[in-house]
């Protein structure tokens, strides 16, 4: 099978029986061609894919670029001819040191001016500043520089914050305020001040506390002439029990009294009956017995009394 030779630009290999030789006719890129003859002398051509390797070549160097930042450049391309299966050896870009001509406008390449003098100290920030300007297109670096003020450049100032709201703490109220004293950021002091005043309300009564023989409760009072500075704790004791203690005790007393009354009644009746039985004896004359102790003949025997 033959390949179209119009697209071929590489070398091909031609062989006379078993002998290969190079043909530079520009046909059969990447192909190999062999020729053999049979015993009758007839020619026979065969084609096969051949891994052809061809080194490439460099084009001519381009012109030098303009000098920028002390360097200029030029380039070349690996296409003369194009390599097959390999690359061109050597550098693609060449650099060379150069000097900027004095007639090149300065604005094309930026440069800094010298630093301006330091400004006066900004006591609010405790800093001072100096500046410089870029002449040209662009410059690397900062256009501002800062440093701390000296301790003697700013007067010492003290500032207070607003007071907080009053907060109740028992018999007194408290509020706070913060202050800051500074001459510069390296020498700063911070503090808190506190202010108190008497509360105009009595505290609520506490719960009842029970001890042997006494029940008491207490509350914190608004300070009087005796306890204005000391905030003395005043306790109030009550001679009456609270209702939730009095009701159970009252019920217990009623139940105990009822039981004691029945017990005493039974004991008294018991002794009374025995006393009557011991003081009366039986004799032949029924008239000597009380009428309620005389049992008529035939009456049922009831000895519950005895």
From Swiss-Prot:
Its main location: membrane. SMART domains: TSP1 (SM00209). One of its GO terms (cellular component) is plasma membrane. Disulfide bonds join 121-149, 123-154, 134-139. The keyword Glycoprotein applies. Gene3D superfamilies: Thrombospondin type-1 (TSP1) repeat. Glycans are attached at residues 58, 61. GO terms for molecular function: signaling receptor activity. It is a single-pass membrane protein. SUPFAM superfamilies: TSP-1 type 1 repeat. Keywords: Disulfide bond, Glycoprotein, Membrane, Neurogenesis, Repeat, Transmembrane, Transmembrane helix. Glycosylated via C-mannosylation by dpy-19 at Trp-58 and Trp-61. The chain crosses the membrane at residues 240-260. It is found in: Membrane. GO terms for biological process: determination of left/right asymmetry in nervous system; neuroblast migration; neuron migration; regulation of canonical Wnt signaling pathway; regulation of cell migration. InterPro entries: Compl_asym_regulator, TSP1_rpt, TSP1_rpt_sf. Residues 55-102, 109-155 form the TSP type-1 domain. Required for determination of left/right asymmetry in nervous system. Acts together with unc-40 to control an initial left-right asymmetric polarization of the Q neuroblasts. Mig-21 and unc-40 may control the asymmetry in Wnt signaling response by restricting posterior polarization to one of the 2 Q neuroblasts. Involved in left-side QL posterior migration. In right-side QR, unc-40 and mig-21 pathways mutually inhibit each other in posterior migration, allowing anterior QR migration. This is Abnormal cell migration protein 21. It comes from Caenorhabditis elegans. The gene is mig-21.
């Amino acid at each position: 099978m033959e390949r179209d030779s119009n697209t071929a630009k590489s070398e091909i290999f031609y062989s006379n029986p078993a002998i290969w030789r190079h043909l530079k006719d520009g046909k059969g890129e990447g192909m190999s061609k062999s020729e053999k003859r049979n015993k009758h002398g007839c020619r026979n051509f065969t084609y096969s894919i051949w891994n052809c390797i061809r080194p490439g070549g460099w084009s001519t160097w381009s012109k030098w670029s303009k000098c920028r930042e002390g360097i200029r450049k030029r380039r070349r391309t690996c296409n003369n001819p194009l390599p097959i299966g390999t690359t061109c050896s050597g550098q693609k870009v060449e650099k060379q040191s150069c000097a900027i001509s004095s007639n090149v406008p300065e604005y094309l390449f930026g440069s800094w001016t010298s630093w301006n003098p330091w400004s006066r100290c900004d006591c609010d920030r405790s800093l001072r500043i100096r500046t410089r300007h870029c002449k040209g297109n662009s410059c690397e670096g900062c256009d501002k520089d800062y440093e701390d003020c000296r301790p003697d450049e700013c007067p010492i100032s003290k500032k207070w914050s607003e007071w907080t709201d009053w907060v109740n703490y028992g018999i007194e109220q408290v509020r706070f305020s913060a202050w800051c004293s500074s001459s510069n950021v390296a020498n700063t002091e911070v503090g808190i001040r506190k202010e108190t005043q008497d509360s105009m309300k009595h505290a609520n009564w506490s719960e009842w506390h029970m001890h042997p023989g006494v029940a008491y409760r207490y509350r914190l009072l608004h300070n009087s002439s005796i306890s204005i500075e000391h905030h003395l704790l005043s306790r109030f004791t009550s001679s009456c029990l609270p209702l939730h203690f009095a009701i159970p005790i009252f019920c217990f007393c009623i139940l105990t009294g009822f039981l004691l009354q029945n017990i005493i009644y039974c004991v008294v009746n018991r002794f009374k009956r025995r006393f009557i039985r011991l003081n009366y004896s039986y004799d032949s004359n029924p008239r000597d017995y009380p009428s309620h102790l005389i049992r008529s003949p035939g009456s049922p025997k009831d000895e519950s009394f005895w």
